[in-house]
Amino acid sequence: MSLDISSSQQFILAAEKLYPQMGYQKLSVRVLAVEAKLSSGLFHHLFANKDDFMAQVFAQHFQRAFGWLAPEFAEDAPPLERLRRLYFQAALSLRDEVPWITRMMIDSADNVATAQQSMQDLVLREFRIVREMVREIAPQLSDEQAMQAISQMQTSILLPILAANTFNRIRVVPDELRQPILQQLTDDALAQRVDWMIKALFSAKETQ
């Protein structure tokens, strides 16, 4: 049994290492076996199929990267401060996970079901937590107004992180802009952007 557990983890760790560069289609059982220094036959013994395996890979990686994203996050802080902390932590985690997230977006666009489902689960988990926080902070908002506020935070705080990293990696921006763009991804810059958006959307609550 211990062999199976250890071998399963070797395959999963191999996938975690190779997936951002190779993606779902190129990450074959043979490639995984070579990286894990195990046999292809053992892979088929341990996992029902490739989709089952990748679902486990995504789940383990996301637990490590986004395990903090839970309803009890910063539960001792006031509601507005909880929201501020959540978006700052989300920005930091997303910045660190850009290679993974962008690869999963590519695979999702190619209709890789396991990538689509894992991404949807993560986004939905964050959305539900944020929605409850917004309802607690501003109960007077209609559902439509709350959705608008959430969409503004998503598009103003999180999506630029993906865009900035992607543009830098594929080198489509002028050299003069590359460093200023990267400076927008520092901890201080991300914290400032979160503060700006929180104040812009919930300024009446800032004194509470």
Give the location of each predicted region.
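Amphipathic alpha-helical packing segments from all-alpha helical-bundle domains
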Residues: 63-70, 113-138, 147-151, 187-195
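C-terminal peripheral helix-coil segments that are non-catalytic and often amphipathic
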Residues: 128-136, 140, 156-208
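Short alpha-helical scaffolding segments that buttress acidic/His motifs in well-ordered protein cores
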Residues: 87-90, 104-107, 153, 157, ...
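Phosphate/oxyanion-binding loops and surfaces in catalytic or ligand/nucleic-acid-binding neighborhoods
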Residues: 64, 93-97, 111, 156-164, ...
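Hydrophobic alpha-helical connector segments
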Residues: 56, 70-96, 140-153
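Amphipathic alpha-helical linker/stalk segments
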Residues: 2, 57-85, 127-134
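Short secondary-structure transition hinges
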Residues: 67, 92-131, 175-183
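Helix-turn-helix
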Residues: 10, 14, 18-52, 56
